[in-house]
Amino acid sequence: MAQTRGNLFILSAPSGAGKSSLINALLKKHTDMKVSVSHTTRAKRPGEENGVHYHFVSTDEFKALITKDDFFEWAQVFDNYYGTSKQAIESQLDAGIDVFLDIDWQGAQQVRKIMPSVQTIFILPPSKAELEQRLNNRGQDSQEIIAGRMAQAQSETSHYNEYDFVIVNDDFDTALTDIETIVMAQRLTLKMQSVRHQSLLNSLLK
């Protein structure tokens, strides 16, 4: 069976929709899936590790990487920058690993221009009230910041129709299964299977 190149997926969601929890659960179940570790200029939160959750860099360092064209995509969110390393993504895809980009709609637009075959998924919360409750339950942000995140959530959600798939994270296990189904379907496309089973197809067609 021939080695196939991995698939690239984008997961986007408003803050509090449960995207990070879904990604973490997905990676625990599937060793052949990885999430890209982004570069960011935002401050490190309690429990976060450099190189594991993000590559934490200064604004000057980030801008230097932009100048060197080292990013697959980058965007400014609130007062911070986020970017995805080209080299890291390409090496994982070449190794047959399915890679997830945890990025917003701005980054998704940039990636589509470079790689039109990318599959994009938007995660929705079950309601606006539930989204606000989840943000409050984090206990990380002030009410002013939460209000800002709610306004940003509305702006981000307005781009849902730019995505290939939309999943409502009402029941966590169901949402996780939905993502797995999308990934498995991509692995069974004609393009992927014709490479993976080239020897079989050749023998059957002789």
From Swiss-Prot:
KW Transmembrane helix (keyword) present: no
Annotated family: Belongs to the guanylate kinase family.
Binding annotation for ATP: A13, P14, S15, G16, A17, G18, K19, S20
Record-level GO cellular component terms: cytosol
Stretches assigned to the Guanylate kinase-like domain: 6-184
Assigned EC number: 2.7.4.8
Protein's UniProt keywords contain Transferase: yes
Top-level EC class: transferase
Pfam families for the chain: Guanylate_kin
Subcellular location: Cytoplasm
UniProt xrefs under NCBIfam families: guanyl_kin
HAMAP family the record matches: Guanylate_kinase (MF_00328)
GO MF annotation, one: guanylate kinase activity
Stated role: Essential for recycling GMP and indirectly, cGMP.
Protein name: Guanylate kinase
UniProt cross-references to PANTHER family, sorted A to Z: GUANYLATE KINASE (PTHR23117:SF13), GUANYLATE KINASE-RELATED (PTHR23117)
Gene3D superfamilies: Guanylate Kinase phosphate binding domain, P-loop containing nucleotide triphosphate hydrolases
Catalytic reaction equation(s): GMP + ATP = GDP + ADP
Organism of provenance: Pseudoalteromonas translucida (strain TAC 125)
Keywords for the protein's UniProt record, in alphabetical order: ATP-binding, Cytoplasm, Kinase, Nucleotide-binding, Transferase
